Amino acid sequence: MSVQSAIRRRTAPDIRARKNGDPIVMLTSYHAHTAALVDRHCDVILVGDSLGNVMHGFETTVPVTLDMMILQGRAVMRGSQQALVVVDMPFGSYEASKEQAFHSAARILKETLCGAVKLEGGVKMAETIAFLTARGVPVMGHVGLTPQSINTLGSFRAQGREEGTWRPIEDDARAVAEAGAFSMVIEAVAEPLARKITESVAIPTIGIGASPACDGQVLVLEDMLGLSPRAPKFVRRYGELGPMIEAAIEGYARDVRSRAFPGPEHVYAMKPKAS
């Protein structure tokens, strides 16, 4: 048995069992090489539709397609060995009907070999979540700020910060949990509300701009590494790789223009003639 085949990959039930346990660590990844790095330290790798912003320069996640998610999901699966890989269902791939959602989710699971899918929405998506889970599709929910709804929300603003706005978000979280999701992301929600939801639902909550009381946390990798020019309020920068990468590129360009690169150690000499 190879070393790789001996490593057990985490599953949705493993994450479900972490409710009120050790905090769940989740980061995004879209490439095999970053997945290999994230895999060593994280419980879950999210192949997020944020790849539309990070990789393709879209202003929102709305233009992301199912084929784009599958392509990057396959890359992340090849680069990782032990983390649960969750792939986002992009806008337009699941909202029309339960059947559409199952067809899209089945493609993701079959073509990437990932362990779960994630979809946005609460009460309105509960029936779809139940339909998927009943047919063998592990689902991670997503409530609070739902970026795919930007055209109806109008802006990426935190939710639940005004009096009288908690009830719909609580209803969404409860509906997701009762529908059979194994966990849920809570994004950009007032801290006391995120804490209350975490205490009230039976499945793990994973916060992003929510509360330290959540059962886990997630960030976009490029945000926390300092590769994004701007980052949301809820991001802590654990590195500033942007300036480091630019300095390396500047050095390369300088050496090429001055003919300092390639040096003798970077080129191939002729083989000696056979005697």
Curated annotation (Swiss-Prot):
Q: What class of enzyme is it?
A: transferase
Q: Which gene encodes it?
A: panB
Protein's recorded name: 3-methyl-2-oxobutanoate hydroxymethyltransferase
UniProt pathway annotation = Cofactor biosynthesis; (R)-pantothenate biosynthesis; (R)-pantoate from 3-methyl-2-oxobutanoate: step 1/2
HAMAP family for the chain: PanB (MF_00156)
Q: Where does Mg(2+) bind?
A: 49, 88, 120
User: Could you give one GO CC term from the UniProt record?
Assistant: cytoplasm
Q: Which GO terms describe its molecular function?
A: 3-methyl-2-oxobutanoate hydroxymethyltransferase activity; magnesium ion binding
Respond yes or no to whether keyword Metal-binding is given for this record: yes
Q: Which InterPro entries match?
A: Pantoate_hydroxy_MeTrfase, Pyrv/PenolPyrv_kinase-like_dom, Pyrv_kinase-like_dom_sf
Tell me which CDD domains the record gives: KPHMT-like (cd06557)
Q: What is catalyzed by this enzyme?
A: 3-methyl-2-oxobutanoate + (6R)-5,10-methylene-5,6,7,8-tetrahydrofolate + H2O = 2-dehydropantoate + (6S)-5,6,7,8-tetrahydrofolate
Q: Which Pfam families match?
A: Pantoate_transf
Fetch the PANTHER family from UniProt.
3-METHYL-2-OXOBUTANOATE HYDROXYMETHYLTRANSFERASE (PTHR20881:SF0)
Functional summary from the UniProt entry: Catalyzes the reversible reaction in which hydroxymethyl group from 5,10-methylenetetrahydrofolate is transferred onto alpha-ketoisovalerate to form ketopantoate.
- Keyword Cytoplasm annotated: yes
Q: Where in the cell is it found?
A: Cytoplasm
Give the EC number(s) listed in the UniProt record. 2.1.2.11
Describe the family membership recorded for this protein in Swiss-Prot or TrEMBL: Belongs to the PanB family.
Supply the alphabetized keyword list.
Cytoplasm, Magnesium, Metal-binding, Pantothenate biosynthesis, Transferase
Tell me one GO biological process term: pantothenate biosynthetic process
Cofactor entry: Mg(2+)
- Residues annotated for 3-methyl-2-oxobutanoate binding in this entry: 49-50, 88, 118
Q: How does it assemble?
A: Homodecamer; pentamer of dimers.
Predominant location of this chain? Answer: cytoplasm
